C-alpha cells in the first residue's frame, strides 16, 4: 500500500480536474491495499493544496479482461485526468484508454512506462529482486523461513515509485514525493490498507 500512497500523492498534486480514478481487479484484502493507499495519498495532497479531490473507484471483477478495463477507464476519463490501476491484464485496457483519451495512467507492480511513454505518469513498483536478496540473506544467516509470509516495505527498498517517474512527473513534485517516502519510512505517515484504517487516517488528517 505504501507505493500506492506515493502515486496517489503525485496524482493529487498533478490533477487539473480535481478528479482522479482507481480501477481494481477484484475486491480483496490485497487490492484494498492499493485502493485505500492510493485514496489516502490523494487526500494527503488535497489537504496540502487546500482543496477537495474526488477519487472515482471502480472494480472490473476480473484480472484478465482488458476490454472491461478499457471500457471502465474510457468512461472515467470523461471527468478524471489521472487513473491508477491494480488489475492485472485489465490494466492494459486502462493504459489503452489513456492513450485514446490523451490522459495520464499510473502503472502497477513493474515500471510500465515502456507500454506508453506519453501517457504512463509513474508506476507503483515491487522490486522483486531486492526482496529475493533480503530473503536469500536471511536464509544464508541461518533463519528458517519455511511456512512464513515475508512482508516488505518502502524501508526495505522493496517497493516504491518507478525509476522513470522523472520522465513525466515534474522535478519539484518528485522532491515532495521523496519527502513523503521519508515520512513513510520513519513511521510519521502510516499508510492505511483497508476501509477502517483509511477512515481513521482521514479523521486524523482532518483533525
Model regions and ranges:
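A residue-level marker of the well-folded mature domains of exported/periplasmic proteins
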Residues: 1-207
Amino acid at each position: 500500500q505504501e507505493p500506492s500512497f506515493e502515486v496517489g500523492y503525485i496524482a493529487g498534486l498533478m490533477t487539473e480536474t480535481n478528479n482522479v480514478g482507481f480501477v481494481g481487479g477484484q475486491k480483496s484484502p490485497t487490492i484494498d491495499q492499493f485502493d485505500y493507499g492510493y485514496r489516502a495519498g490523494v487526500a494527503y495532497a488535497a489537504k496540502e493544496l487546500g482543496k477537495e479531490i474526488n477519487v472515482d473507484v471502480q472494480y472490473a471483477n476480473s484480472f484478465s479482461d482488458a476490454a472491461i478495463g478499457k471500457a471502465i477507464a474510457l468512461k472515467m476519463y470523461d471527468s478524471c485526468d489521472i487513473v491508477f490501476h491494480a488489475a492485472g491484464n485489465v490494466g492494459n485496457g486502462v493504459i489503452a484508454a489513456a492513450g485514446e483519451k490523451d490522459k495520464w495512467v499510473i502503472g502497477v507492480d513493474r515500471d510500465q512506462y515502456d507500454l506508453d511513454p506519453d501517457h504512463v505518469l509513474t508506476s507503483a513498483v515491487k522490486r522483486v529482486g531486492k526482496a529475493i536478496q533480503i530473503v536469500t540473506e536471511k536464509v544464508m544467516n541461518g533463519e528458517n523461513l519455511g511456512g512464513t509470509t515475508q512482508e516488505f516495505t518502502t524501508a526495505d527498498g522493496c517497493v516504491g515509485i518507478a525509476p522513470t517517474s522523472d520522465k513525466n512527473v515534474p522535478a519539484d513534485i518528485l522532491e515532495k514525493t521523496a519527502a513523503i517516502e521519508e515520512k513513510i519510512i520513519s513511521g510519521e505517515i502510516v499508510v492505511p490498507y483497508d476501509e477502517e484504517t483509511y477512515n481513521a487516517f482521514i479523521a486524523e488528517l482532518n483533525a
